[in-house]
UniProtKB/Swiss-Prot annotation:
The gene is xpt. The keyword Transferase applies. This is Xanthine phosphoribosyltransferase. The keyword Transferase applies. InterPro entries: PRibTrfase_dom (IPR000836), PRTase-like (IPR029057), Pur/Pyrimidine_PRTase (IPR050118), Xanthine_PRibTrfase (IPR010079). The lineage of its organism: Bacteria, Bacillati, Bacillota, Clostridia, Lachnospirales.
Length: 192
């Protein structure tokens, strides 16, 4: 998605060679027009998949996932990273380690929001090593739901996430695929 790539080049900041800071438009301050266009792109790409729910992990995936869910006219389910007093014992949980923070957390899904009849579009802001997506897929498998596709805003293609997810048999559709980045440049994989 050229619009997202252009915004990354304009407002993204590379830290080292592995971290891309997108605080100005995705995960601290959110550009609602960009999120609407991202939601439209995901909705169009996955239009023939019979999606019944969009799922994301809190918190940076919420804005684009909500826009996609709205365009598809389906509910959004948010996987929780923190225990909540409103979520009781009837839960699916799995441990996930964040690439960015290098901390582990218990990814949690209430059993009453996803069923075996659901056809899921999983959306997340980044894909690096694929750990978050793999954890979300584990939870959705526990619920016996079908993962119809995975939508990623920014993929670090020089890391193994896509390969890991593809090896599990899932389609990954990324809007901006970075093949190389350092503090001076960001190079994208150009899609046809």
């Amino acid at each position: 998605m050229k619009e997202l790539q252009d915004r990354i080049l304009k407002d993204g900041q590379v830290i080292g060679t592995n971290i891309l800071k997108v605080n100005k438009f995705i995960n601290h301050q959110v550009d609602p027009v960009l999120m609407e266009h991202i939601g439209e792109d995901f909705a169009n790409h996955f239009a023939d998949k019979g999606i019944t729910k969009v799922v994301t992990i809190e918190s940076s995936g919420i804005a684009p996932a909500l826009m996609a869910a709205a365009k598809m006219n389906v509910p959004l389910v948010i996987l929780k990273k923190q225990p909540s007093k409103t979520l009781h014992n009837d839960l699916y949980q799995t441990q996930v380690t964040s690439f960015t923070t290098e901390k582990s957390y218990e990814l949690t899904l209430s059993r009453d929001v996803i069923s075996e009849d659901d056809n899921i579009l999983l959306i997340d802001d980044f894909m690096a090593d694929g750990e978050a997506a793999t954890g979300a897929i584990r939870l959705l498998r526990m619920a016996h739901a079908t993962v119809a596709g995975i939508g990623i805003l920014i993929e670090k293609s020089f890391q193994p996430g896509r390969r890991k997810i593809n090896e599990q048999g899932y389609e990954v559709y990324s809007l901006a695929r970075i093949k190389y980045m350092d503090e001076y440049q960001i190079d994208f994989i150009e899609e046809n």
